[in-house]
Regions:
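Conserved donor-binding loop and adjoining core beta-sheet/short helix segment
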Residues: 37-137, 147, 261-287
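Extended hydrophobic-aromatic, low-complexity segments
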Residues: 223-224, 247, 261-269, 277-289, ...
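Active-site proximal loops enriched in glycine and acidic residues that flank catalytic Cys/His/Asp
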Residues: 255, 269-273, 292-297, 304, ...
């Protein structure tokens, strides 16, 4: 079965190189992974390899349900997209949350009319973002994409498409020593950290999942580009890939404000496992990645963040891991980067966020385009 998006990108006419778009299918996953890997290696040869299972889920698995995406391929003689051709480009838009659309794309370095093709795909991203905004009933949605600061090629494409560089993120790494399994300081009096409670099935107790979600939402409310992710959206992302959820790497910090033994949630930490991999400079061992760390605003100043971080470090040491990684806003309003440096983290790379606010538009399926829209 070969399918086209109902409102596909308007691709440039390239003499001698006719192109068309179609919906991704299973055979496209490995060629797209190769494109992503080559683009990544061009700027960061030490990066972890592309996770093929994760990409497969995004392109043709459960995660594809929240995305609109196409691959670009050569055409058949009749102008339709070739079903058996390896993609030369891929673009995906995820309806992440109310007012937030995540963008991911790649174009082969030798693709014909590459700049024109990039412009066409970004224009389609704006089209798709506008449809998401209409469906959500919001005034706009924010197209968002993160790139390596060294990726000048991608930065030029995004700037030409109207996106703006808005933030820099520090990716930090801390080595782990075996003795840190039981040598780190404990939490302050009145603070404790525990893993989320698990059922015999291995799944977490619902109350703890909701507590972690609430702590993260409340803690990030005053951060840059913060957006509300409902619990339904949060849990849906977990359900999409339950095998990837490292429930043993979820922690809740609790605080006893009045000293009466009434422990209440004060912060949450969600982490995941980073497999060992080879790089251009040798092997990187297995590590822990801190996906989300949040402290409720009412609990700041009690050492909650340090307690959560130490819990993750000690756990990594017990598992024989050699590092703990995280990402932080270079201009964090809570100066979190300073805390991480004081605890041994060092910056290993930087990325940038590029954004574009897109207004909603009428449905192209139900209403014809106006002359202005088609200009």
């Amino acid at each position: 079965v070969q399918l086209s998006d109902h409102v596909p990108p308007r691709l440039p006419e390239i003499p001698g190189h006719p192109l068309a778009s179609r919906v991704p299918m299973e055979p496209d996953v490995e060629p797209v992974a190769a494109l992503l890997g080559a683009a990544q290696d061009a700027v960061d040869p030490d990066a972890a390899p592309i996770d093929l299972d994760d990409l497969r889920s995004r392109m043709v698995g459960l995660r594809s349900w929240s995305r609109r995406q196409v691959v670009i391929v050569p055409t058949e003689a009749d102008g339709t997209a070739r079903a058996d051709a390896a993609p030369i480009a891929w673009i995906a838009l995820e309806d992440r949350a109310r007012g937030r659309t995540d963008l991911q794309s790649v174009i082969a370095p030798d693709a014909p009319a590459r700049e024109a093709l990039s412009a066409a795909l970004i224009a389609w991203a704006v089209e798709v973002g506008g449809s998401f905004a209409r469906h959500r009933g919001v005034d706009s949605t924010q197209l968002s994409i993160d790139i390596d600061v060294r990726d000048a090629d991608r930065a030029a494409q995004l700037a030409a498409g109207g996106l703006e560089k808005v933030r820099t993120w520090l990716h930090m790494r801390r080595g782990v020593l075996a003795q840190e399994a039981d040598s780190l300081p404990g939490p302050r009096p009145g603070v404790r950290v525990r893993p989320v409670h698990l059922h015999p099935s291995g799944l977490p107790v619902a109350q703890d999942v909701r507590s972690v979600h609430r702590m993260l939402e409340e803690s990030f409310a005053d951060h840059f580009s913060s957006y509300r992710e409902s619990f339904a959206e949060f849990s849906q992302r977990l359900v999409e890939s339950p095998e990837e959820a490292d429930w043993e790497l979820w922690w809740i910090a609790e605080i006893d404000h009045d000293g009466d033994g009434a422990w209440l949630p004060a912060g949450g930490l969600v982490a995941s496992t980073r497999p060992a991999h080879e790089t251009g400079h040798g092997r990187v061992g297995e590590g822990t990645y801190l996906d989300y760390l949040g402290v409720h605003r009412s609990a700041r100043g009690h050492g909650v963040a340090k307690a959560l971080l130490r819990a993750a470090i000690a756990d990594a040491a017990r598992r024989g891991r050699d590092h703990v990684d995280l990402e932080v806003d270079a201009d964090s309003p809570t100066s979190a980067d300073g805390l991480y440096r004081s605890m041994g983290w060092e910056t290993c790379e930087r990325t940038q966020s590029w954004h574009l606010d897109v207004p909603p538009h009428p449905s192209r399926l139900l209403e014809p385009e106006t002359e202005d829209e088609n200009a």
